[in-house]
């Protein structure tokens, strides 16, 4: 019955003209969100050099942290309301079902490296804030300022625009007109839809990466500096297992990118892997995840990448006026170099 249901969905998507971008190849396989080619290349060469799936994810994400991919990964981007850049990252071992993650990491540039140390040197899953920084220092990471002229200028400009946009509601003074500090307004007004400015696809460009090793071992990971002008302490989907990324050797791996506050509520990466476990092609699994979120948040910004343990892969995204196509990178034995793929949003 499940197979019949999957076939029916596939036929429906084709009839409606919904695009399917899918592929397959002999293992190994690297897939990551956005056209971050250097990250893909680093992960791929790690595999060719004998590294593990975890090594590939860590090295790939670390490249984006160093290169400050699109200003939304690594230091010097997405300042919070106080002007500080903080980092979120996670890495997951789909063989042992083990995870290491950091949220709101301060003053440490290599967030994915710290997440790997959480996985390898603790029995915890997630460390946050100043305590995560202390842990990182104990592991040999350097404490240094994550702000740059670019992030300071972004923050100054935001203040000059009366702190617009921001993420407050039901407070005084009116957050749509004034900066804080804020306090509760005394009454709650239920929003019909979440506060959204015109979507800037460069405000949520988490790198999410999935790797299928030639042995079939899987790994997944993410790294991001979050959203611009977030309320200090905010953590999105990226460092949360099942939300930002997920991997399981018995099915596959997936990662998400976009509006983390919305994505976090649906565990899209876990859901995609479970769809693949049930027999769905990765492209179909990704689309089913997007369609599921659409029911509640039709205007959400997000995309998902999926890869099965047999080397098949796919992606899907939610269509908006300013976001109609999603680019992602693939590296496998069929290509001499990382290849950019595009999928039309649904």
From Swiss-Prot:
Query: Which cysteines share a disulfide bond?
Result: 64-69, 163-179, 286-306, 317-345
One GO cellular component term of this record is: lysosome
Q: What residues does substrate bind to?
A: 234-237, 257-260
The signal peptide stretch is 1-23
Q: What is its main location?
A: other
Task: Supply the SUPFAM superfamilies for this chain.
Answer: N-terminal nucleophile aminohydrolases (Ntn hydrolases)
Q: Where, per UniProt, does this protein localize?
A: Lysosome
A GO biological process of this protein is: proteolysis
Chemical reaction(s) catalysed: N(4)-(beta-N-acetyl-D-glucosaminyl)-L-asparagine + H2O = N-acetyl-beta-D-glucosaminylamine + L-aspartate + H(+)
Glycan attachment positions = 38, 310
Family per record: Belongs to the Ntn-hydrolase family.
* Function recorded in the entry: Cleaves the GlcNAc-Asn bond which joins oligosaccharides to the peptide of asparagine-linked glycoproteins.
| Name used for this protein in its record | N(4)-(beta-N-acetylglucosaminyl)-L-asparaginase
Instruction: Please report the organism this UniProt entry assigns to the protein.
Output: Mus musculus (Mouse)
What taxonomic lineage is listed for the species of origin? Eukaryota, Metazoa, Chordata, Craniata, Vertebrata
Q: Which gene encodes it?
A: Aga
């Amino acid at each position: 019955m499940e197979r019949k249901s999957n076939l029916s969905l596939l036929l429906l998507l084709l009839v409606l003209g919904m695009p399917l971008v899918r592929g397959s190849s002999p293992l190994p396989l690297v897939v990551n969100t956005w056209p971050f080619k250097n990250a893909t290349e680093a992960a791929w060469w790690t595999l060719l050099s004998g590294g593990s799936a975890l090594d590939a994810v860590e090295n790939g994400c670390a490249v984006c942290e160093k290169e400050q991919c699109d200003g939304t990964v690594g230091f010097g981007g997405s300042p919070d309301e106080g002007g500080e850049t903080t980092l979120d990252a996670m890495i997951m071992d789909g063989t042992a079902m083990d995870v290491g993650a950091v949220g709101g990491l301060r003053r440490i540039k290599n967030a994915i490296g710290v997440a790997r140390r959480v996985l390898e040197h603790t029995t915890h899953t997630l460390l946050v804030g100043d305590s995560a920084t202390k842990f990182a220092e104990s592991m040999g990471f350097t404490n240094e300022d994550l702000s740059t002229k670019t992030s300071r200028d972004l923050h100054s400009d935001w203040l000059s625009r009366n702190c617009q946009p921001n993420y407050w509601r039901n407070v005084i003074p009116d957050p749509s007109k004034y900066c804080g500090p804020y306090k509760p307004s005394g009454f709650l007004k239920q929003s019909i839809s979440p506060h959204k400015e015109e979507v800037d696809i460069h405000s949520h460009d988490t790198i999410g990466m999935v790797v299928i090793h030639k042995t079939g071992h899987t790994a997944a990971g993410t790294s991001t500096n979050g959203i611009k002008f977030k309320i200090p302490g905010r953590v999105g989907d990226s460092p949360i297992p099942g939300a930002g990324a997920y991997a399981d050797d018995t099915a596959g791996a997936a990662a998400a990118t976009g509006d983390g506050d919305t994505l976090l509520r649906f565990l899209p990466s876990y859901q995609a892997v479970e769809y693949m476990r049930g027999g769905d092609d990765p492209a179909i699994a990704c689309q089913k995840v997007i369609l599921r979120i659409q029911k509640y948040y039709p205007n959400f910004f997000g995309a998902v990448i999926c890869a099965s343990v047999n080397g098949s892969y796919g992606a899907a995204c939610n269509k908006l006026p300013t976001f109609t196509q999603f680019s992602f990178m693939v590296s496998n034995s069929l290509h001499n170099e990382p290849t950019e793929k595009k999928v039309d949003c649904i």
